[in-house]
């Protein structure tokens, strides 16, 4: 069976030098997210022994800094760093999909959302809130989880689906892919007009 062993390789594209650099060859890293300083990658890893982990990798030399077992041995499918260096993980458990927050300084995990059977994807942090896409109401829309009140708010009301949220640099507009009968189009809304 080891004849078919394979790896996932952590790489990045250097725009200034116009080349691809391999950071960590022959690993089992998935779903990389880069910290605000561009020095550390948080990645998901499934070990040969079947443990699911969050791993912090030094992007300068590819060395593993630390690894942490995921609660309930959940599989992390997406990661994102917040402004406070805490990491949000969308994870698949035996009972569904959940949203975890991880604090690298303490090594503590916190479950932010109860496990659900609907898909959650494309997480981003903005102003202390987590924005993501989900089909919770039957159609994919953009949602926001506010840790201050532990509530989830639907922000868009797309007819066929809203995907891949992102904020403009000025922070005044939410951009997303709006699915239409003739394909995807880029849409945006002023932040103060969202369905909060």
Q: Which sequence ranges carry the predicted segments?
A:
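A flexible loop/linker signature enriched in serine peptidases of the S9 family
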Residues: 1-10, 24-29, 43-55, 69-75, ...
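Short loop/turn segments that connect beta-strands within beta-propeller blades
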Residues: 14-18, 58-62, 103-107, 146-150, ...
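A short beta-strand motif characteristic of beta-propeller blades
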Residues: 18-24, 63-69, 108-114, 151-156
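Residue-level detector of Asp-centered blade-edge/turn motifs that repeat once per structural unit
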Residues: 36-37, 82-84, 125-127, 169-170
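Strand-loop-strand
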Residues: 153, 157-160, 168, 173
């Amino acid at each position: 069976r080891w004849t078919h062993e394979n790896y996932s390789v952590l790489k990045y594209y250097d725009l200034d030098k116009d080349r691809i650099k391999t950071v960590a060859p022959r690993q089992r890293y998935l779903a990389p997210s880069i910290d605000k300083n561009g020095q550390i990658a948080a990645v998901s890893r499934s070990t040969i022994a079947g443990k699911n982990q969050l791993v912090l990798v030094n992007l300068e030399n590819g060395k593993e800094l630390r690894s942490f077992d995921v609660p309930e041995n959940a599989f992390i499918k997406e990661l994102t760093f917040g402004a406070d260096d805490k990491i949000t993980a969308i994870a698949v458990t035996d009972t569904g999909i959940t949203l975890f927050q991880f604090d690298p300084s303490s090594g503590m995990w916190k479950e932010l959302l109860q496990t659900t059977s609907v898909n959650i994807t494309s997480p981003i942090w903005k102003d202390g809130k987590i924005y993501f896409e989900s089909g919770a109401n039957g159609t994919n829309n953009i949602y926001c989880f506010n840790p201050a009140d532990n509530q989830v708010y639907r922000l868009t009301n797309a007819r066929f689906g809203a995907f891949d949220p992102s904020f403009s640099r000025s922070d005044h507009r939410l951009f997303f892919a709006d699915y239409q009968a003739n394909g995807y189009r880029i849409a945006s809304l002023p932040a103060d007009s969202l369905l909060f």
